[in-house]
């Protein structure tokens, strides 16, 4: 007899039939279906955070605060940073602030605050600024532009 596709068969014991649990005694895994005695864990798993009927942690601890998803994040820099890194008459942009390592992230918005003194005339382009910082820059003849 020659070997042909219709003659091929598996070696005995190579393929096992799937046991369908909980489908009656005749199926081989009926009644308790390998789950042991009756009880809570036989039914299904207990839900996440369940502590056996004790008042769970997330209900014992009081609620507090929330996370504002509309919050505007600014990277802050001060007039003292500008004083030490720029010459009189320079233009200060967000890109130049990043290149001079004043800002840590290139694409984050930046806000200028009035900490420190300024002795130079500068043109500053930024996303936001404090009124005190604007006043100090304009006193020295500089100007502020909002980007």
UniProtKB/Swiss-Prot annotation:
Provide a Gene Ontology MF annotation, just one: rRNA binding
Top-level taxon of the source organism: Bacteria
Keyword list (alphabetical) reads:
Ribonucleoprotein, Ribosomal protein, RNA-binding, rRNA-binding
> Does the record carry RNA-binding as a key word?
yes
Read off the SUPFAM superfamilies from this record. Answer: Ribosomal proteins L15p and L18e
Q: Which PROSITE patterns match?
A: RIBOSOMAL_L15
GO CC annotation, single: cytosolic large ribosomal subunit
Q: Name one GO biological process term.
A: translation
Residue segments, region Disordered? 1-46
Q: Bias category Basic residues: which stretches?
A: 16-28
Per the record, the similarity remark reads:
Belongs to the universal ribosomal protein uL15 family.
Q: State its role.
A: Binds to the 23S rRNA.
Q: Which NCBIfam families match?
A: rplO_bact
Complex formation: Part of the 50S ribosomal subunit.
Record protein name field: Large ribosomal subunit protein uL15
Q: What broad taxonomic lineage does this protein's source fall under?
A: Bacteria, Bacillati, Mycoplasmatota, Mycoplasmoidales, Metamycoplasmataceae
């Amino acid at each position: 007899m020659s070997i042909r596709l219709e003659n091929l068969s598996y070696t005995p014991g190579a393929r096992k039939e799937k046991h369908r649990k909980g489908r009656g005694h005749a199926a081989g895994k009926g009644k308790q279906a390998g789950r042991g005695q009756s009880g809570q864990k036989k039914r299904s798993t207990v839900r996440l955070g369940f502590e056996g009927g004790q008042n769970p942690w997330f209900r014992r601890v009081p609620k507090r605060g929330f996370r504002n998803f509309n919050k505007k994040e600014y990277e802050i820099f001060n007039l003292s940073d500008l004083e030490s890194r720029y010459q009189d008459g320079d233009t200060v942009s967000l890109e130049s602030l990043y290149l001079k390592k004043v800002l840590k992230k290139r694409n984050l918005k930046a806000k200028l605050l009035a900490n420190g003194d300024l002795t130079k005339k500068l043109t500053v382009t930024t996303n936001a600024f404090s009124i005190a910082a604007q006043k100090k820059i304009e006193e020295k003849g500089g100007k502020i532009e909002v980007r």
